[in-house]
């Protein structure tokens, strides 16, 4: 149970700014107004998207009943666990500027849009 208390996978989540060319700048762990190097973070869509980096890990889903289940995560390839490769997840709800979606703080989220449109607009940034 000690590993559960320490949250080893979740403790490796890192906030960052991800640009369209793939450049990553990590936020200060306790102050997302600044990067790790101490420079100030701007709130501009031209500077990229605010994301959370999810590390390489392993997971399994344990089902206890129809509506009762849990996801177990590990840094190690335990038997029955599936590899989850590093990914980036938006830190904020999607904000649309024109036909492109962004993850930028202090913006009103885009609503009343279907899933297909959201996916198309989210992909535009990295094309």
Task: List the predicted regions and their residue ranges.
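Long, low-complexity, polar/charged, intrinsically disordered or flexibly structured peripheral segments
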Residues: 37, 67-68
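Short aromatic-cysteine micro-motif
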Residues: 41-48, 70-127
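Short, solvent-exposed loop/turn elements at domain surfaces
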Residues: 60-65, 96-100
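Conserved hydrophobic ligand-interaction patch in extracellular adhesion modules
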Residues: 1-60, 108-127
């Amino acid at each position: 149970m000690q590993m559960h208390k320490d949250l080893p996978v979740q403790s490796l989540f890192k906030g960052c700014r991800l640009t369209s060319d793939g450049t990553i700048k990590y936020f200060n762990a306790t102050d997302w107004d600044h990067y790790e190097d101490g420079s100030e973070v701007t709130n501009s869509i031209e500077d990229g998207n605010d994301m959370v980096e999810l590390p390489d890990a392993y997971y399994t889903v344990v089902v206890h009943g129809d509506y009762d289940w849990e996801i177990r995560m590990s840094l190690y390839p335990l038997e029955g666990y599936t590899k989850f490769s590093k990914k980036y997840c938006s830190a904020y709800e999607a904000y649309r500027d024109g036909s492109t979606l962004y993850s930028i703080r202090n913006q009103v989220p885009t609503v009343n849009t279907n899933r297909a449109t959201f996916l198309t607009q989210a992909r535009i940034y990295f094309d």
